[in-house]
Swiss-Prot record:
The gene is trpD. InterPro entries: Anthranilate_Pribosyl_Tfrase (IPR005940), Glycosyl_Trfase_fam3 (IPR000312), Glycosyl_Trfase_fam3_N_dom (IPR017459), Glycosyl_Trfase_fam3_N_dom_sf (IPR036320), Nuc_phospho_transferase (IPR035902). This is Anthranilate phosphoribosyltransferase. Catalyzes the transfer of the phosphoribosyl group of 5-phosphorylribose-1-pyrophosphate (PRPP) to anthranilate to yield N-(5'-phosphoribosyl)-anthranilate (PRA). It catalyses: N-(5-phospho-beta-D-ribosyl)anthranilate + diphosphate = 5-phospho-alpha-D-ribose 1-diphosphate + anthranilate. Its cofactor is Mg(2+). It comes from Pyrococcus furiosus (strain ATCC 43587 / DSM 3638 / JCM 8422 / Vc1).
Amino acid sequence: MLEKIVENRHLSFEEAYDLFNILKEESEVRIAAYLAALQTKGYTSEEIAGFAKAMRDNAIKLDLGEVLDTAGTGGDKSFTINVSTASALILSEYTKVAKHGNVSVTSRSGSANLLEALGINIKISPEKAKEMIEKVNFTFIFAPMYHPALKRIMPVRKELGIKTIFNILGPLANPANPAYQVVGVNSRDLVEKMARALNYLGVKRATVVHGSGLDEISPEKETIVAEVNRGDIDFYTVTPEDFGLARTKVIPCYSPEESAERIRAVLRGNGKNEDRNFVLINSAMALYTIGIASDLKEGVELAENVLGEKIIKKLEEIACLSKS
Protein backbone atom coordinates (compact mmCIF):
# COMPACT_ATOMS: atom_id res chain seq x y z
CA MET A 1 0.00 0.00 0.00
CA LEU A 2 2.95 2.35 0.62
CA GLU A 3 4.01 2.06 -3.02
CA LYS A 4 0.51 3.04 -4.14
CA ILE A 5 0.57 6.19 -1.99
CA VAL A 6 4.07 7.14 -3.17
CA GLU A 7 2.80 6.81 -6.75
CA ASN A 8 0.17 9.43 -5.89
CA ARG A 9 -2.74 6.99 -6.14
CA HIS A 10 -5.64 7.35 -3.73
CA LEU A 11 -6.82 4.65 -1.33
CA SER A 12 -10.39 3.43 -1.10
CA PHE A 13 -12.35 3.72 2.15
CA GLU A 14 -11.60 0.05 2.84
CA GLU A 15 -7.89 0.41 2.10
CA ALA A 16 -7.61 3.44 4.40
CA TYR A 17 -9.42 1.50 7.13
CA ASP A 18 -6.99 -1.39 6.70
CA LEU A 19 -4.00 0.96 6.66
CA PHE A 20 -4.85 2.30 10.11
CA ASN A 21 -4.91 -1.26 11.43
CA ILE A 22 -1.55 -1.91 9.76
CA LEU A 23 0.00 1.24 11.24
CA LYS A 24 -0.82 0.32 14.82
CA GLU A 25 1.49 -2.72 14.47
CA GLU A 26 4.14 -1.24 12.16
CA SER A 27 7.73 -0.23 12.87
CA GLU A 28 8.45 3.42 13.58
CA VAL A 29 10.23 3.82 10.25
CA ARG A 30 7.31 2.49 8.23
CA ILE A 31 4.75 4.47 10.25
CA ALA A 32 6.74 7.62 9.47
CA ALA A 33 6.99 6.67 5.79
CA TYR A 34 3.23 6.08 5.49
CA LEU A 35 2.31 9.32 7.27
CA ALA A 36 4.76 11.45 5.29
CA ALA A 37 3.76 9.88 1.97
CA LEU A 38 0.06 10.34 2.68
CA GLN A 39 0.60 13.96 3.69
CA THR A 40 2.60 14.63 0.52
CA LYS A 41 -0.07 13.04 -1.67
CA GLY A 42 -2.95 14.74 0.11
CA TYR A 43 -5.94 12.83 1.42
CA THR A 44 -9.43 12.28 0.09
CA SER A 45 -12.73 12.16 1.95
CA GLU A 46 -12.69 8.36 1.59
CA GLU A 47 -9.25 8.15 3.19
CA ILE A 48 -10.24 10.50 6.02
CA ALA A 49 -13.40 8.49 6.67
CA GLY A 50 -11.56 5.15 6.53
CA PHE A 51 -9.04 6.28 9.12
CA ALA A 52 -11.76 7.80 11.32
CA LYS A 53 -13.90 4.66 11.19
CA ALA A 54 -10.89 2.52 12.12
CA MET A 55 -10.10 4.85 15.01
CA ARG A 56 -13.67 4.55 16.29
CA ASP A 57 -13.68 0.77 15.91
CA ASN A 58 -10.37 0.46 17.78
CA ALA A 59 -11.42 2.84 20.55
CA ILE A 60 -12.74 1.84 23.97
CA LYS A 61 -16.47 1.34 23.47
CA LEU A 62 -18.85 4.01 24.70
CA ASP A 63 -22.61 3.65 24.20
CA LEU A 64 -24.28 6.94 25.11
CA GLY A 65 -27.23 6.83 22.72
CA GLU A 66 -27.81 9.68 20.27
CA VAL A 67 -25.48 12.53 21.17
CA LEU A 68 -24.10 15.75 19.72
CA ASP A 69 -20.42 16.68 19.45
CA THR A 70 -19.00 20.13 18.69
CA ALA A 71 -15.33 20.15 17.79
CA GLY A 72 -12.75 21.78 15.58
CA THR A 73 -9.59 20.51 13.95
CA GLY A 74 -7.54 23.28 15.51
CA GLY A 75 -4.56 24.50 13.55
CA ASP A 76 -5.96 27.89 12.58
CA LYS A 77 -3.33 29.70 14.72
CA SER A 78 -5.88 32.31 15.76
CA PHE A 79 -5.47 31.78 19.53
CA THR A 80 -9.15 32.21 20.34
CA ILE A 81 -11.15 31.28 23.41
CA ASN A 82 -12.40 27.70 23.18
CA VAL A 83 -15.75 28.46 21.56
CA SER A 84 -16.77 24.88 20.70
CA THR A 85 -16.51 23.82 24.34
CA ALA A 86 -18.41 26.87 25.58
CA SER A 87 -21.12 26.07 23.03
CA ALA A 88 -21.19 22.43 24.16
CA LEU A 89 -21.97 23.53 27.72
CA ILE A 90 -24.82 25.77 26.52
CA LEU A 91 -26.17 23.03 24.26
CA SER A 92 -26.35 20.58 27.15
CA GLU A 93 -29.40 22.55 28.32
CA TYR A 94 -31.20 21.29 25.21
CA THR A 95 -29.66 17.94 24.22
CA LYS A 96 -27.12 15.28 25.19
CA VAL A 97 -23.56 16.41 24.41
CA ALA A 98 -20.53 14.10 24.33
CA LYS A 99 -17.57 16.39 23.76
CA HIS A 100 -14.56 14.51 22.38
CA GLY A 101 -11.31 16.41 22.77
CA ASN A 102 -7.74 16.77 23.86
CA VAL A 103 -5.25 19.29 25.14
CA SER A 104 -4.37 22.25 22.93
CA VAL A 105 -3.10 21.68 19.39
CA THR A 106 -2.43 25.24 18.23
CA SER A 107 -4.76 27.39 20.30
CA ARG A 108 -3.78 28.49 23.78
CA SER A 109 -6.65 26.49 25.25
CA GLY A 110 -7.80 23.10 24.00
CA SER A 111 -11.10 21.67 25.23
CA ALA A 112 -9.37 19.62 27.92
CA ASN A 113 -7.36 22.64 29.09
CA LEU A 114 -10.50 24.76 29.35
CA LEU A 115 -12.63 22.20 31.19
CA GLU A 116 -9.87 21.61 33.73
CA ALA A 117 -9.60 25.37 34.26
CA LEU A 118 -13.38 25.38 34.87
CA GLY A 119 -12.93 22.76 37.60
CA ILE A 120 -14.14 19.74 35.64
CA ASN A 121 -12.39 16.37 35.93
CA ILE A 122 -11.65 15.28 32.36
CA LYS A 123 -10.12 11.88 33.13
CA ILE A 124 -13.31 9.93 33.77
CA SER A 125 -14.21 6.30 33.11
CA PRO A 126 -16.74 5.18 30.47
CA GLU A 127 -19.11 4.37 33.33
CA LYS A 128 -18.81 7.90 34.70
CA ALA A 129 -19.24 9.32 31.19
CA LYS A 130 -22.53 7.46 30.85
CA GLU A 131 -23.68 8.62 34.29
CA MET A 132 -22.93 12.23 33.38
CA ILE A 133 -24.85 12.03 30.11
CA GLU A 134 -27.84 10.61 31.96
CA LYS A 135 -27.76 13.13 34.83
CA VAL A 136 -26.46 16.40 33.37
CA ASN A 137 -26.66 15.90 29.56
CA PHE A 138 -22.91 16.52 29.21
CA THR A 139 -19.75 14.47 29.29
CA PHE A 140 -16.16 14.89 28.14
CA ILE A 141 -14.36 12.12 26.31
CA PHE A 142 -10.63 12.69 26.82
CA ALA A 143 -9.12 11.31 23.62
CA PRO A 144 -5.86 9.83 25.04
CA MET A 145 -7.88 7.58 27.39
CA TYR A 146 -10.03 6.10 24.62
CA HIS A 147 -7.64 5.41 21.73
CA PRO A 148 -5.08 2.77 22.82
CA ALA A 149 -4.42 1.88 19.17
CA LEU A 150 -2.57 5.18 18.79
CA LYS A 151 0.08 4.20 21.34
CA ARG A 152 2.72 3.41 18.68
CA ILE A 153 1.60 6.02 16.16
CA MET A 154 1.49 9.20 18.26
CA PRO A 155 5.20 9.30 19.28
CA VAL A 156 6.18 8.93 15.61
CA ARG A 157 3.75 11.64 14.57
CA LYS A 158 5.25 13.95 17.19
CA GLU A 159 8.82 13.11 16.15
CA LEU A 160 8.03 13.78 12.49
CA GLY A 161 7.20 17.39 13.30
CA ILE A 162 4.92 17.86 10.29
CA LYS A 163 1.17 17.90 9.85
CA THR A 164 -0.36 14.49 9.19
CA ILE A 165 -3.84 13.12 8.64
CA PHE A 166 -4.15 12.79 12.43
CA ASN A 167 -4.23 16.59 12.71
CA ILE A 168 -7.77 16.57 11.32
CA LEU A 169 -9.14 13.25 12.61
CA GLY A 170 -10.00 14.31 16.17
CA PRO A 171 -13.50 15.66 15.42
CA LEU A 172 -14.36 12.47 13.48
CA ALA A 173 -12.97 9.92 15.95
CA ASN A 174 -15.46 10.27 18.81
CA PRO A 175 -15.99 6.72 20.17
CA ALA A 176 -19.57 7.66 21.12
CA ASN A 177 -20.40 7.75 17.38
CA PRO A 178 -22.37 11.01 17.59
CA ALA A 179 -25.52 11.24 15.49
CA TYR A 180 -25.13 15.01 15.24
CA GLN A 181 -21.95 17.04 14.80
CA VAL A 182 -20.69 20.55 14.23
CA VAL A 183 -17.13 20.37 12.92
CA GLY A 184 -14.87 23.37 12.45
CA VAL A 185 -12.00 23.05 9.96
CA ASN A 186 -8.90 25.22 9.57
CA SER A 187 -8.95 25.35 5.76
CA ARG A 188 -11.71 25.99 3.22
CA ASP A 189 -10.28 23.07 1.20
CA LEU A 190 -11.29 20.73 4.03
CA VAL A 191 -14.96 21.77 4.17
CA GLU A 192 -16.21 19.46 1.43
CA LYS A 193 -13.80 16.63 2.31
CA MET A 194 -14.91 16.55 5.94
CA ALA A 195 -18.58 16.78 4.99
CA ARG A 196 -18.26 13.79 2.67
CA ALA A 197 -16.27 11.91 5.32
CA LEU A 198 -19.12 12.50 7.80
CA ASN A 199 -21.49 11.04 5.21
CA TYR A 200 -19.34 7.92 4.97
CA LEU A 201 -19.47 7.65 8.76
CA GLY A 202 -23.28 7.69 8.73
CA VAL A 203 -23.97 10.88 10.68
CA LYS A 204 -27.65 11.93 10.73
CA ARG A 205 -27.08 15.67 10.54
CA ALA A 206 -23.92 17.74 10.69
CA THR A 207 -22.44 21.04 9.67
CA VAL A 208 -18.83 21.65 8.69
CA VAL A 209 -17.72 25.27 9.00
CA HIS A 210 -14.74 27.43 8.10
CA GLY A 211 -14.91 31.06 9.13
CA SER A 212 -12.43 33.06 7.05
CA GLY A 213 -9.37 31.46 8.61
CA LEU A 214 -11.07 30.17 11.77
CA ASP A 215 -12.11 26.60 12.56
CA GLU A 216 -15.31 28.18 13.93
CA ILE A 217 -18.09 30.38 12.59
CA SER A 218 -16.62 33.86 12.32
CA PRO A 219 -18.30 36.67 14.27
CA GLU A 220 -16.58 39.15 11.96
CA LYS A 221 -16.49 37.78 8.42
CA GLU A 222 -18.07 35.24 6.08
CA THR A 223 -18.22 31.55 6.99
CA ILE A 224 -18.40 28.66 4.54
CA VAL A 225 -20.84 25.92 5.61
CA ALA A 226 -21.42 22.37 4.39
CA GLU A 227 -24.70 21.04 5.79
CA VAL A 228 -24.98 17.25 5.88
CA ASN A 229 -28.49 15.85 6.20
CA ARG A 230 -28.99 12.08 5.96
CA GLY A 231 -26.75 11.69 2.93
CA ASP A 232 -27.36 15.03 1.23
CA ILE A 233 -24.85 17.89 1.38
CA ASP A 234 -25.69 21.57 0.82
CA PHE A 235 -23.05 24.28 0.60
CA TYR A 236 -23.64 27.93 1.49
CA THR A 237 -22.16 30.90 3.32
CA VAL A 238 -23.35 32.76 6.41
CA THR A 239 -22.45 36.09 7.98
CA PRO A 240 -23.11 37.43 11.50
CA GLU A 241 -26.11 39.31 10.08
CA ASP A 242 -27.77 35.95 9.30
CA PHE A 243 -27.77 35.35 13.06
CA GLY A 244 -29.27 38.77 13.75
CA LEU A 245 -26.00 40.03 15.23
CA ALA A 246 -23.62 42.87 14.42
CA ARG A 247 -20.09 42.00 13.34
CA THR A 248 -17.56 41.89 16.15
CA LYS A 249 -13.83 41.21 16.21
CA VAL A 250 -12.15 38.10 17.57
CA ILE A 251 -10.12 38.90 20.69
CA PRO A 252 -6.99 36.72 21.12
CA CYS A 253 -6.67 34.49 24.18
CA TYR A 254 -3.36 33.81 25.92
CA SER A 255 -3.98 30.95 28.38
CA PRO A 256 -6.51 28.31 29.50
CA GLU A 257 -7.11 30.39 32.62
CA GLU A 258 -7.95 33.47 30.57
CA SER A 259 -10.19 31.39 28.29
CA ALA A 260 -12.01 29.97 31.33
CA GLU A 261 -12.44 33.41 32.89
CA ARG A 262 -13.83 34.94 29.69
CA ILE A 263 -16.12 32.00 28.96
CA ARG A 264 -17.40 31.94 32.53
CA ALA A 265 -18.22 35.65 32.11
CA VAL A 266 -20.15 34.89 28.90
CA LEU A 267 -22.07 32.11 30.64
CA ARG A 268 -22.88 34.44 33.56
CA GLY A 269 -24.30 36.90 31.04
CA ASN A 270 -21.80 39.69 31.58
CA GLY A 271 -18.96 38.78 29.23
CA LYS A 272 -17.39 40.96 26.56
CA ASN A 273 -19.74 41.54 23.63
CA GLU A 274 -17.12 40.12 21.24
CA ASP A 275 -16.87 36.86 23.20
CA ARG A 276 -20.64 36.67 23.68
CA ASN A 277 -21.35 36.99 19.95
CA PHE A 278 -18.65 34.45 19.11
CA VAL A 279 -20.17 31.87 21.47
CA LEU A 280 -23.78 32.63 20.51
CA ILE A 281 -23.38 32.22 16.75
CA ASN A 282 -21.57 28.91 17.13
CA SER A 283 -24.16 27.65 19.63
CA ALA A 284 -26.94 28.78 17.28
CA MET A 285 -25.53 26.76 14.38
CA ALA A 286 -25.47 23.64 16.55
CA LEU A 287 -29.06 24.21 17.72
CA TYR A 288 -30.08 24.56 14.07
CA THR A 289 -28.09 21.46 13.08
CA ILE A 290 -29.88 19.20 15.58
CA GLY A 291 -33.28 20.63 14.65
CA ILE A 292 -34.08 22.41 17.91
CA ALA A 293 -33.90 25.85 16.27
CA SER A 294 -35.78 26.38 13.01
CA ASP A 295 -33.27 29.00 11.86
CA LEU A 296 -30.08 30.70 12.98
CA LYS A 297 -31.77 33.70 14.61
CA GLU A 298 -33.93 31.42 16.74
CA GLY A 299 -30.75 29.53 17.63
CA VAL A 300 -29.23 32.72 19.03
CA GLU A 301 -32.37 33.38 21.09
CA LEU A 302 -32.36 29.85 22.52
CA ALA A 303 -28.66 30.09 23.40
CA GLU A 304 -29.19 33.48 25.05
CA ASN A 305 -32.07 32.09 27.11
CA VAL A 306 -29.78 29.83 29.17
CA LEU A 307 -27.11 32.41 29.96
CA GLY A 308 -26.99 33.57 33.55
CA GLU A 309 -27.65 31.74 36.80
CA LYS A 310 -29.12 28.67 35.06
CA ILE A 311 -26.03 27.70 33.09
CA ILE A 312 -23.64 28.65 35.92
CA LYS A 313 -25.51 26.27 38.21
CA LYS A 314 -25.30 23.62 35.49
CA LEU A 315 -21.55 24.14 35.22
CA GLU A 316 -21.21 23.57 38.97
CA GLU A 317 -23.28 20.36 38.70
CA ILE A 318 -21.07 19.07 35.89
CA ALA A 319 -17.90 19.82 37.87
CA CYS A 320 -19.20 18.15 41.04
CA LEU A 321 -20.46 15.05 39.25
CA SER A 322 -17.19 14.64 37.33
CA LYS A 323 -15.30 14.41 40.64
CA SER A 324 -17.70 12.15 42.54
